[in-house]
């Protein structure tokens, strides 16, 4: 029984990233392999580093320029970043792997015994990692995790200087942001690492109406408060009583009939809570304007009856 084989993979010329050793490297092949199958549609930016240490010290560095390799022999550390979703404009995942090269770094192998051994040691969200440039001259990065674990990683000497400049640019991008556009516009998504600036749009949708609904301004709120306080001040004076009890009753009925409860719909205050308030405050912290106005009108109506009695 013959097996149907698929088409051979497309042969492409290696890009400049592959030649520099920052794309399609061992870390990318590891997480895209069937064993892990992680972020298969995302690009991985990676480089080889040497973890540094200072002799006769508990810390990895004490004085500038006094470094020692932590890993013995030809062991190296691969540091890389990628995106959990290909459409994200910035990477959001940090990867670290320990590599042992039997024949030395960047060497080719023809037999499985000469292949490098790679173990994925860290897979962390970038928002829980602090990445800094510690020493530009010696090309050293400082990586601090949320558990206060600090790594001092020196870029391998096999990498040219341009590779470290890529890491310098990456650190600046992660700190300040780069773009609000996506990598692939065909992929639809509802979240973005970089906040999108508001744009003037004439189209109104249910979501846009919530986002564009203005928040009640302070002058309008003060005006409503003055009108409410004025109605309370009018209720403080009792109607003059006459000798005839029937006339008193008629006066009170006329006062009640002349007072009308304003409709909340006719109020100039916009009662829609904007989406910004919903994002910055929890539901129980938001003030319900409908309930507030209704309580004021009921209190005014009851106060008029009690004060006029």
Swiss-Prot record:
The modification Phosphoserine is found at residues 231, 263, 267. It comes from the Eukaryota. GO terms for biological process: acrosome assembly. GO terms for cellular component: Golgi apparatus. Keywords: Golgi apparatus, Phosphoprotein. Transmembrane segments: none annotated. The keyword Cell cycle does not apply. It is found in: Golgi apparatus. Its main location: Golgi. The keyword Phosphoprotein applies. Belongs to the GARIN family. RAB2B effector protein required for accurate acrosome formation and normal male fertility. Interacts (via N-terminus) with RAB2B (in GTP-bound form). This is Golgi-associated RAB2 interactor protein 1A. It comes from Homo sapiens (Human). The gene is GARIN1A.
């Amino acid at each position: 029984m013959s097996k149907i084989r698929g088409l051979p993979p497309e042969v492409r010329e290696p890009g400049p990233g592959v030649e520099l050793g920052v794309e399609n490297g061992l870390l990318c092949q590891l997480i895209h392999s069937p064993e892990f199958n992680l972020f298969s549609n995302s690009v991985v930016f990676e480089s080889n580093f040497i973890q540094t240490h200072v002799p006769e010290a508990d810390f990895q560095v004490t004085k500038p320029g006094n470094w020692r390799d932590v890993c013995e022999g030809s062991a190296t550390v691969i540091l890389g970043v990628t995106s959990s979703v290909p459409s994200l404009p910035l990477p959001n995942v940090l990867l670290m792997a320990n590599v042992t090269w039997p024949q030395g770094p960047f060497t080719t192998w023809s037999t499985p015994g000469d292949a490098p051994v790679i173990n994925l040691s860290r897979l962390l969200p970038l928002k829980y990692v602090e990445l800094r440039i510690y020493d530009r001259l010696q090309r050293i990065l400082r990586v601090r995790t949320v558990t206060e674990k600090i790594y001092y990683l020196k870029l391998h000497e096999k990498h040219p200087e341009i590779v470290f400049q890529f890491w310098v640019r990456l650190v600046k991008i992660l700190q300040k942001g780069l773009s609000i556009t996506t990598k692939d516009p065909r992929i639809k998504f509802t979240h973005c690492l970089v906040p999108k600036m508001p744009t003037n749009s004439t189209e109104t949708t249910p979501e846009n109406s919530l986002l564009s609904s203005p928040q009640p301004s302070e002058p309008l709120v003060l005006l409503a408060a003055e009108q409410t306080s004025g109605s309370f001040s009018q209720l403080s004076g009792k109607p003059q009583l006459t000798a005839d009890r029937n006339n008193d009753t008629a006066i009170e009925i006329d006062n009640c009939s002349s007072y009308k409860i304003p409709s909340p719909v006719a109020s100039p205050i916009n009662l829609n809570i904007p989406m910004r308030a919903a994002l910055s405050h929890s539901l129980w912290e938001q003030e319900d304007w409908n309930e507030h106005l209704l309580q004021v009108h009921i209190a005014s109506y009851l106060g008029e009856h009690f004060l006029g009695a």
